[in-house]
């Protein structure tokens, strides 16, 4: 009897590490100390901060993983994992510094999980943070064949005086919406149920879709770090940032407004076809759509109304599609006009 016969293949682990080494190294920032393989990752705080505050976030990808398994496509899931974490850290105004991942599977497939980590590295590059370390657990009998779980953890930094917590948001402030890339990483339990009850598979291509249902739904979550951080460094007064994740617009927008509320104009932004298809095919009510999906908006910013046009133009030059979607109001919660 040995470890391999018990279901843990150490040699496969070595192969996996060899496959990911180059992708991980490409994410390296100057503040990183040491390299791959240490017991802990070392990272020096960047210079220039008077009162640095660390901001931490952790998240996973949820049942979007089931779609990756069904299509045997694993190169985008890692980007999703990074995006879910770094966008949350960004919502406090922070610059993401480093990221760590946790991967668990029943039987380690070096090629499959290397694809996941390569996606994580791509997401880290897009967010400007280091992939500082990670854990890969091979757990025989714990997961179905070919399946795995992934979670991430991100740490960022922000000057104490520049923390964005919604407390400076004022009634009348403009709300700007940054377009999402699609469903992102929330609501997939409902998505999967809709597709199942409709008797469809992931290769089905609805009439108004640019690709198959599976390809559209696997589009990775958009990472907003660089354009929004650039706007902050350019001096724009962004007073609140809402990352539109689980809970949709209904639950997430108020989290960024310091106890105030939002009036959103429904016709002010285009809702991507994937959402109208899900609503129609699944017979999903408007309230459920509003509190489950991002409906085409991945990030919502609150800023003084006199800066709204300039901020919108600035972010557009950074490659974002930005729309003025409403205003901050006195009454808490979200209402639609």
From Swiss-Prot:
S-S bridge residues: none
Keyword Glycosyltransferase set for record: no
Entry keywords, A to Z: ATP-binding, Cytoplasm, Ligase, Nucleotide-binding, Purine biosynthesis
GO molecular function, one term: phosphoribosylamine-glycine ligase activity
Domain of life: Bacteria
Pathway: Purine metabolism; IMP biosynthesis via de novo pathway; 5-amino-1-(5-phospho-D-ribosyl)imidazole from N(2)-formyl-N(1)-(5-phospho-D-ribosyl)glycinamide: step 2/2
Reactions performed catalytically: 2-formamido-N(1)-(5-O-phospho-beta-D-ribosyl)acetamidine + ATP = 5-amino-1-(5-phospho-beta-D-ribosyl)imidazole + ADP + phosphate + H(+)
Main location: cytoplasm
GO biological process, one term: adenine biosynthetic process
Top class in the EC scheme: ligase
GO annotations of cellular component type: cytosol
Keyword ATP-binding among UniProt keywords: yes
Cell compartments where the protein resides: Cytoplasm
EC number of the protein: 6.3.3.1
One Pfam family recorded for the sequence: AIRS
NCBIfam families associated with the record: purM (TIGR00878)
PANTHER family per UniProt: TRIFUNCTIONAL PURINE BIOSYNTHETIC PROTEIN ADENOSINE-3 (PTHR10520:SF12), TRIFUNCTIONAL PURINE BIOSYNTHETIC PROTEIN ADENOSINE-3-RELATED (PTHR10520)
Family in the record: Belongs to the AIR synthase family.
Protein name in UniProt: Phosphoribosylformylglycinamidine cyclo-ligase
Organism: Gloeobacter violaceus (strain ATCC 29082 / PCC 7421)
């Amino acid at each position: 009897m040995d470890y391999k016969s018990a279901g843990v293949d150490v040699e496969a682990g070595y192969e996996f590490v060899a496959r990911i080494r180059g992708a991980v190294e490409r994410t390296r920032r100057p503040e990183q100390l040491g390299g791959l393989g240490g017991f802990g990752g070392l990272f020096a705080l960047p210079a220039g901060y008077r009162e640095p505050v660390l901001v931490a976030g952790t998240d996973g990808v949820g049942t979007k993983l089931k779609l990756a398994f069904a299509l045997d496509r694993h190169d985008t899931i890692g980007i999703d994992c990074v995006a879910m974490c770094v966008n949350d850290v960004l919502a406090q105004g922070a610059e993401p510094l480093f990221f760590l991942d946790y991967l668990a599977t029943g039987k380690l497939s070096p090629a499959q999980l290397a694809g996941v980590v390569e996606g994580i590295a791509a997401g880290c590059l897009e967010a400007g943070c280091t992939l500082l370390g990670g854990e890969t657990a091979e757990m025989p009998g714990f997961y179905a064949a070919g399946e795995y779980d992934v979670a991430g953890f991100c740490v960022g930094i922000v000057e104490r005086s520049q923390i964005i917590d919604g407390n400076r948001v004022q009634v009348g402030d403009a709300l700007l919406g940054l377009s999402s890339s699609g469903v992102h990483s929330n609501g997939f339990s409902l998505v999967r149920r809709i597709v199942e009850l409709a008797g469809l598979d992931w290769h089905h291509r609805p009439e108004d879709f640019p690709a198959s249902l599976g390809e559209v739904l696997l589009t990775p979550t958009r990472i907003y770090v660089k354009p929004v951080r650039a706007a902050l460094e350019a001096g724009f007064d962004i007073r609140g940032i809402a990352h539109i994740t689980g809970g949709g617009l209904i639950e997430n927008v108020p989290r960024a407004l310091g106890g105030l509320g939002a009036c959103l104009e429904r016709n002010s932004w285009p809702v991507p076809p994937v959402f109208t298809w899900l609503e129609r095919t699944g017979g999903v009510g408007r309230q459920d759509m509003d509190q489950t999906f991002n409906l085409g908006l991945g990030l919502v910013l609150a800023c003084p109304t006199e800066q709204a046009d300039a901020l919108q133009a600035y972010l557009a030059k950074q490659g974002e599609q930005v729309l003025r979607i409403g205003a901050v109001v006195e009454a808490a919660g979200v209402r639609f006009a």
